[in-house]
Amino acid sequence: VPATDALPFRGMPCLVWAYGFDADGSGHPLEVATLDDEHLSKARQEHAWLWLHFDTSDARTPQAIARLGLSEEITEALLSHDTHVSLQMEGVTAFGVFVDWRHQRGVDIGKHSFARSEKEVGWLHFAVGADLLVTARRQALRSVEQVHQHVRGGVHFDSVAEVLEAIVEQFAASVAHATDELGTELDRIEDRVLTDRLGEERRDLAVLRRQG
């Protein structure tokens, strides 16, 4: 979409959220309904850096992302349906795809069991530059939601890269948690199997004694 063309909608309603971060690392929500080119430019001037999180299932997202001034390759990567982890560099901008658990709305993130019900994965497309983090996904993603909660809760992030690192760390922690849960469940299954076997051996022994 050429930058001179007017968008057929106001603001950026295809954004899930948008934050402006100050030099001290504190994040402040931006009003996506009024975030047009003028307000976006003003936000970039007023804040050290921005985090824009898009919903790629929204048909308006390609037009909105096209107005961010990113290269064609980075724009295509953000909007692609690629389901392979990747990381590329173009100048000072890193972009690619990360894997994450899909998140069900209304589920308590802190108490949810990954190993039992988080069987499907989703894909986070991202581009991170010096003063702009753009992330995009089709479904809500668990680690991204967790980091978003941290931002809303007042956790400070000193750089664009720190937010992306936090998302990756959340996913890694969830994988470790799932592995631990799986190991515990396997131990329980093994204990039940051994108990059943022991019960069978005792029954066999009782039969042999009666036969004797």
Where are these regions (language model features)?
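Peripheral, non-transmembrane regulatory/ligand-interaction domains of membrane transport proteins
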Residues: 1-212
